[in-house]
Amino acid sequence: MSESSVPKTPSGDDSEADLYKSGIYLFMDVVNPDNCKDVIEFILKQNTEKKRKKKLQLMICSPGGDMPSCFALIDVMKGSKIPIHTVGLGLIASCGLLLFIAGEHGYRVLTPNTSILSHQFSWGNWGKEHELFAQVKEFELSTKRMLDHYKKCTGLDEEQIREHLLPPEDVWLSAKEAKKLGI
């Protein structure tokens, strides 16, 4: 578990335990299997409490990271019986942005000094020719997943997404610009 995230089972009266009890998770890290697992466990535990909270809040400052882990967390966020509100802090980039927009529409907040980066994802691979061709299929599936996620969460169509959020070059946005794009 990353030191910057809320503990899975908080102890004592420290501020992290208070956040956990309040239904707030502070995610300030790269997106990877370990820290996504921690957030998934947090959401699942909150959903199985006898007295559920009215909302959960996921505060995100992330440079991005691992797509499969990101989509695992997105699936759990979308399946949560408790609405998840998101807050973008400092930097939400790449997978960090995908997590941010998975928050309930109308309850996504970008702080004024948040930098937002959207871009086509990158990947690398090696292997025999047939293995590389097989990986192309996963690349195509991941691209489709990302486009579908942007469509559902922003209301933009594929052409608008490719033009404004996923062109060949990196796209940096201010909070105001992001809001205009449905982020």
Segments and roles (model prediction):
Residues 1-183:
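Terminal-region recognition feature
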